[in-house]
């Protein structure tokens, strides 16, 4: 006898998000409506996905990351093993801000910073720029990419750029490794505000999703 056809099932829509648009912090997140994020929450809020943030590190104090960070590491040589101590004297909070935009939890009463995917998990991978690192930058990125893939990342976020179109040879294998494991790599087209006329690596690497 022919096998029975599977019975289709629907995924239940997630419950409502604790969301107070009158909160000054929440009201300042204009992209929640402008980019259709609140509408997207009716379908998914990132549950089951893991986002690796390769940046200066996700700080430990903000309550918006309670139960959000599933793991981490440091590739700079100057951070802590869990990747939760921001690295660098300048813009050390950059990684925390990036993570809050990605998967900040907000507060239970609907106030505070909330991310695009507030039910996703985060991996905090701290790297250093320039003198803030004891390891060459290209080596840090290659190591971080492989660690993220090996530790369950579904998405890798790189909110930084360089001033050259080309990239270190070690990045070829590292980015290919992510591609071969079906990991989406999201990269900033630029990170210098106005005046940037050239899109640099890693945004120029084939296969990445470049956002500008």
Model-assigned labels for residue ranges:
Residues 129-204:
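Substrate-binding/access-modulating region of protease and related hydrolase catalytic domains
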Residues 83-163, 212:
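Subtilisin-like peptidase catalytic core
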Residues 70, 76, 123, 184-186, ...:
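Structural detector of well-ordered beta-strand residues that form the stable sheet scaffold
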Residues 64, 207-210:
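Glycine-centered tight turns that cap/initiate beta-strands
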Residues 1-4:
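Secretory targeting and sorting signals
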Residues 50-53, 155, 186, 210:
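Short glycine-aspartate micro-motif
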Residues 13-15, 19-119:
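Active-site core segment of subtilase-fold serine proteases
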Residues 6-12:
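Extracellular mucin-like PTS domains
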